[in-house]
Amino acid sequence: MDDKEMIGAIQSTMYHQCQWRGYAAPADILVDIGVLSRKKYEDWRYGRISYLESACTVNLRKLSWIMHQIRSYGSQSGLKPSFCYYKQWGVKKLSGQGHKPVIPLRFSKSGNLEIERWYATHFVDSKRIAQLKVETAIRNG
């Protein structure tokens, strides 16, 4: 896929995610455009892969470019950036009691805080969220 096709795929994916649930998430975009398999994404969420970038099929330079395109489209489309804390799935309670420990997930090889923050930033379509809430209320009401 050349750069122009990739930009089209990113924008289309972000648009459809926003229509479906009111926001677009970079990790889901990577899955939808074929850069990250669903299985490897789930392996990362369960802690079987140490950082998300290692599971992607493109190099770090291309991944950085994709992330830039995601941020650009979000900004151009008036989507609101919103940080989302990613924690490991499937964590058991220690000794069967109390709260489960929270294990944060890592996105990048470097662990750079700015890179981590951009991977964890969802792009929210506030107007679409309001529409979805009304549609849900009508269905349930």
Residue ranges and their predicted role:
Residues 39, 60-141:
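Phospho-regulated, low-complexity intrinsically disordered regions of nuclear gene-regulatory
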Residues 2-27, 32, 36-37, 43-55:
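Positively charged, polyanion-binding regions of nucleic-acid-associated proteins
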